[in-house]
Amino acid sequence: MRISSKVPNSGPLPAALGIGPMAARLEAAGFDGLWCSDHIVMPAVAESYYPFGDDGKVSWDPQMPWYDAVVAMTMTAAATARAEVGVAVLVLPLRQPVTFAKQVASIDALTGGRMALGVGAGWLAEEFEALGVDYATRGARLDEWMALLRDCWTGFPAARDGAHYTLP
């Protein structure tokens, strides 16, 4: 059995203790995987149903810092030697897919294959609105982005004129 832990990339701990030192301690404690979470924008007010709470209402402090997931993964990878590094669920439709494919492939190559990735369509409509992405298209974007990521990672990113992304 493999056991993983979340490396905090939100709240006061990352700035106080450092993501790298926390990751190193977790790896030394025997964890096999180290995962962070992902949000780009946390709105002060959200009406979206929060799927991780008992009452469906958001419970975060809008002033709480959320550090970028790719940066957190990179710091975690740099501070460890053995543990798998990843994002529990990255909101892929909010990312530029070719840039993100390169970032993840770079982390994977530079860690000797320790990168893992969980992706999802996202649940926070206000985050999509803040970033100018149509929330209603998140599922279609996820499908399109995943196909493009796979093509980039296998070395054959064919030109495409997708519904949401064009690759010349």
What are these regions (language model features)?
Residues 1-79:
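N-terminal beta1-alpha1-beta2 module of alpha/beta enzyme domains
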Residues 4-6, 85-88:
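Short beta-strands and strand-loop turn motifs
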Residues 44-45, 55-59, 74, 83, ...:
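Internal, glycine-rich beta/alpha segment that forms the wall or movable "lid"
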